[in-house]
Curated annotation (Swiss-Prot):
InterPro entries reported for this sequence: Soti (IPR031397)
GO terms classed as biological process: sperm individualization
Protein name (database record): Male-specific protein scotti
Pfam families: SOTI
Function recorded in the entry: Post-meiotically transcribed gene that has a role in late spermiogenesis; required for actin cone progression during spermatid individualization.
Superkingdom, taxonomy of origin: Eukaryota
Gene for this chain: soti
Glycosylation sites recorded in the entry for this protein: 128
Amino acid sequence: MDVLHAHDLYGEQLIDRVGDAVNEDAGDDLDTLVEGQQQQRLGVYRQMDILLDAPQEPPLGVFPAQGGPNGPPRLRKKRSFYTMTKPTPPCQSQEPEMCVLMASVTRAMRHVREDQRGEYFANYLVENMTSQNYPNGVGLPQHWGQL
């Protein structure tokens, strides 16, 4: 009679882990790699799971606009573009501040055809921006961007 010994039954199987015996694994670590990847994915998504499980911030009962310990709900003021704008004084709504030379060239350009205005503008400045027309620089731009 053959007597079965425990070590004879499992002598042929090398068990790395419990999963190897259940899955009849050949002893390679393929399932270990797959499980490691699953653990890594769980670690990546752990923070997202924590955020999704978190309660709404702030809790609706504590927020004063919804009522609660601070008193009755307060109505929020609705803002509109028309209510936020302030009327400008009449002097600001007209033409912006400009030097005398720019004002005169603007007036002169109104009488020139649209396709010739660029050339006319340059010629007008060359002819009229002289020390004879503006003695001691009075009326000329005092800083960049004033033209």
